[in-house]
């Protein structure tokens, strides 16, 4: 596989910060500057096709930057052939940076662990949970620049997100509202969320439950959790509420320091 020599620098980003509903006031230090804490890359690898992590395999990317050498196509739906990594049942991807030169980042085709994985710039989605019944565990790492979703949960089962950093995003987590009447759940802890629309979206009429406690922090985020009414026939979901509901269980979040 060809190796690219360019290293990925730490990105320093400037943004205005406002307090959203149920959020603490903006931190004055953060209002001056937010630095997305992506690690320095140890090298670059461009795949000509998706790299498959076998069932039960642990793949350590050693903090290299991985991509596909293509331009992002925005919110045009990609497919499995457009991914950087495909993780099979019980597989683990850790210590990797997903570069901006890709369309679909990572697919999990069963329970998976995503540990200390960073997205330089999200394209359509960062992580898509396509098959299986979980659990799907995301620990550490982070993503930025997601026009819409970071984690897309299509399959059934539980998602656990802990210690993730998300900046300049639409939704950190979204339970699929067009994938049929399937119950899904997510627990989100110790997340740093800066400059986004909503941390999570859940389908109340499908029995989804998203839990977000005060171990998380949020600055300039419009909503903590959004409840939708999904359409079992695949129609576009309707936003119902940004308050606490049976589907969205959350506490007031402090501003990020």
Swiss-Prot record:
Its cofactor is Ca(2+). Binds 1 Ca(2+) ion per subunit. It catalyses: Eliminative cleavage of (1->4)-alpha-D-galacturonan to give oligosaccharides with 4-deoxy-alpha-D-galact-4-enuronosyl groups at their non-reducing ends. GO terms for cellular component: extracellular region. InterPro entries: Pectate_lyase_PlyH/PlyE-like, Pectin_lyas_fold, Pectin_lyase_fold/virulence. One of its GO terms (molecular function) is pectate lyase activity. The keyword Protein biosynthesis does not apply. Its EC number is 4.2.2.2. Residues 1-24 form the signal peptide. It is found in: Secreted. GO terms for biological process: cell wall organization; pectin catabolic process. Disulfide bonds: none annotated. It comes from the Eukaryota. Keywords: Calcium, Carbohydrate metabolism, Cell wall biogenesis/degradation, Lyase, Polysaccharide degradation, Secreted, Signal. Pectinolytic enzyme consist of four classes of enzymes: pectin lyase, polygalacturonase, pectin methylesterase and rhamnogalacturonase. Among pectinolytic enzymes, pectin lyase is the most important in depolymerization of pectin, since it cleaves internal glycosidic bonds of highly methylated pectins. Favors pectate, the anion, over pectin, the methyl ester. Belongs to the polysaccharide lyase 3 family. This is Probable pectate lyase G. It comes from Emericella nidulans (strain FGSC A4 / ATCC 38163 / CBS 112.46 / NRRL 194 / M139).
């Amino acid at each position: 596989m060809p190796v690219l020599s360019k290293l990925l620098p730490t990105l320093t980003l400037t943004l205005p910060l406002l307090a959203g509903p149920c959020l603490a006031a903006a931190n004055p230090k953060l209002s001056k500057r937010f630095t997305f804490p992506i690690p320095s890359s140890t090298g670059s690898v461009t795949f000509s096709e998706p790299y498959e992590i076998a069932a039960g395999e642990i793949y350590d990317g050693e903090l290299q930057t991985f991509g596909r050498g293509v331009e992002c196509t925005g919110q045009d739906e990609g497919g499995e052939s457009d991914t950087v990594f495909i993780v099979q049942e019980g597989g683990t991807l850790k210590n990797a940076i997903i570069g901006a030169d890709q369309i679909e980042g990572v697919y999990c085709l069963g329970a998976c662990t995503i540990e200390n994985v960073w997205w330089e710039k999200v394209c359509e989605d960062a992580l898509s949970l396509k098959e299986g019944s979980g659990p799907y565990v995301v620990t550490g790492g982070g993503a930025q620049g997601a026009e819409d979703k970071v984690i897309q949960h299509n399959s059934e089962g539980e998602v656990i997100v802990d210690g993730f950093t998300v900046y300049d995003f639409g939704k950190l987590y979204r339970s699929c509202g067009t994938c049929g009447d399937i119950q899904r759940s997510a627990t989100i802890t110790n997340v740093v969320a800066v400059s986004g629309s909503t941390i999570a979206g859940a389908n109340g009429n499908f029995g989804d439950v998203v839990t977000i406690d005060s171990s998380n922090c949020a600055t300039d985020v419009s909503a903590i959790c959004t409840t939708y009414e999904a359409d079992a026939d695949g129609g576009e979901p309707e936003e119902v509420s940004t308050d606490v509901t049976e589907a969205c269980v959350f506490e007031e979040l402090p501003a990020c320091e």
